[in-house]
Regions:
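Short helix-boundary/capping micro-motifs
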Residues: 12-30
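A short LG(V/I)-centered, amphipathic sequence patch enriched
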Residues: 42-59, 64
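Alpha-helical linker/hinge and terminal dimerization helices associated
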Residues: 44-45, 66-88
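Central regulatory/effector-binding core of bacterial HTH transcription factors
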Residues: 92-154
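Beta-alpha-beta core module
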Residues: 155-160, 165, 225-277
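Flexible hinge/capping segments at coil-to-helix
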Residues: 159-167, 171-193, 283
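Secondary-structure junction motif
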Residues: 181, 191-215, 281-282
Length: 291
């Protein structure tokens, strides 16, 4: 038995809105038409999906199971239509690459430039994402490859370290360490480290704090209020320090100084992708980045 993708799309809207009224408005359907679509889908599947009440709509266990598969199913269908239309128009194959703020746009561009995949036969689309968005965007096929500073891929995804970048220190131009050509991690014992996400939630934050502990001190740290911005900008307007991968020297129009960190310490760039997908282009890209 085949699934009617229109009904699946209707179901996803109901599941996400938890309301027939809001879902109908989102789909630009009448509530009666949407209700009929949901009843028809339940008949086709032979199981109830929704618990309907005056307070709204809740998913039954069967509905939760269908929703988990429906989102990537719709994304795959949309992607398939896009690929077919691009092929018909003779347009290049599209590979969508997401990256978190800790892997800067400049670093992504430098890694991609000159790869076999970067040719006129391929279109590379780069998208900036927050760390907690990356896994979901891979699962729903919004992106094909995710680049992050994580040490392991999100649950249910495959991953490979494709690069390592040297860590350095970023401080405000007026900071007491700004005149230094190089610092060591123990030099930061009295400083407040600005990180991009909370410890215990972000693997990269845990990695950076772990490096400080290995250097012999428990780091004071705080999370930047500016989410989605490059790490080098997180020291603007405060006296904190940030561990970054930018080149040494002035940054952010001279408002920030990037200082060498000794001895040399590197952090990974992890490429992640879906286990249930096959892409020769993605394989070439990952192999090229790792070489």
């Amino acid at each position: 038995m085949g699934l009617d993708l229109r009904k699946v799309e209707h179901f996803v809207a109901v599941a996400e809105e938890r309301s027939m009224t809001r879902a109908a408005a989102r789909l630009r359907l009448s509530q009666q038409a949407l209700s009929m679509s949901m009843r028809a889908l339940e008949r086709e599947l032979g199981v109830p999906l929704l618990d309907r009440s005056s307070r709204g709509v809740a998913l039954l266990a069967s509905g939760e199971a269908l929703y988990a598969d429906a989102v990537p199913l719709l994304a795959a269908a949309t992607a398939a239509v896009g690929r077919a239309r691009r092929a018909d128009r003779g347009e290049p194959e599209l590979l969508r690459i997401g990256h978190t703020p800790a892997v800067t746009g400049i670093e992504v561009t430098e890694m991609l430039a000159g790869l076999p995949a970067a040719s006129e036969d391929v279109a590379l689309q780069v998208v900036a994402l927050l760390p907690d968005e990356l896994g979901g965007r891979l699962r729903d096929r919004f992106i094909d490859v995710g680049l992050s500073r994580a040490t392991a891929p999100p649950d249910g995804l495959a991953g490979q370290v494709v690069a390592r970048h040297r860590l350095r220190l970023a401080v405000r131009a007026a900071h007491r360490l700004a005149h230094r050509l190089a610092v060591t991690l123990p030099d930061l014992a009295a400083e407040t480290l600005v990180v991009g996400a909370p410890a215990g939630v972000c693997a990269y934050t845990d990695l950076l704090l772990g490096l400080c502990r290995q250097a012999g001190f428990e780091p004071r740290h705080r999370v930047t209020p500016f989410q989605g911005t490059p790490p080098v900008t997180t020291v603007l307007g405060n006296d904190g320090v940030a561990l970054v991968t930018e080149a040494p020297g002035p940054a952010v129009g001279g408002a920030v100084r990037v200082i060498e960190l000794e001895p040399e310490t590197t952090v990974p760039v992890l490429a992640s992708w879906r286990l249930d997908t096959r892409s020769a282009l993605r394989a070439v890209l990952v192999a090229g980045l790792a070489s």
